Amino acid sequence: AKGTGSVQYGTDALGGVIQLFSKEPDFTTGKAKLSGNGLIKYMSGNMEKTARASLTYSTERIAFTGGITLRDFGDLIGGDTTGKQTPSGYDEWSLNAKVKFLITKTIQLTISHQQLKQTHVPLYHRVKLENFALSEFDLQKHQLQYAKFEANTNLKWADKFTLIGSHQQTNEGRTSRRNGSNMLRNENDDVQ
């Protein structure tokens, strides 16, 4: 890591902004459309099992897409002499939904919700290297909601006006207990 931020925030520090766009549902012309997709993924060595189901519905004025994903990450298997890294596996589920409304030919409203929940995420390095019998994140939860209002214009100085309001919430719990100790330590951070 480079720069002064790497010292303050550690080697995982990331500078700048990354803007990612999730899947957009499309409006249809004519009849309403309904479709779905599914995905099942299995990785050998019990390292990952994933199942996802998604649904898309659209009309001339309303378009929706959403889905749910369930994941079971098993313990990591290292190469050479590392072997199985226990404990390192955890469970996760995520949910996403986005609906768009075509209010007029030039005005559109989008409402979106994303949610991720992870349970019993172990900190392998603390258990193996730092004398802990138990050290894990439980529970980790992140939610993001936003509403986006877009209006196309015929103005010379602007093609479109966009107004976005968003809210996000992160909850992180940590549980730990040192080897040979009966004291279980629970911590919780809730950021909005």
Where are these regions (language model features)?
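Solvent-exposed coil/turn segments that connect beta secondary-structure elements
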Residues: 3-4, 23, 43, 116
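Transmembrane beta-barrel wall of Gram-negative outer-membrane proteins
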Residues: 42-72, 82-120, 141-152
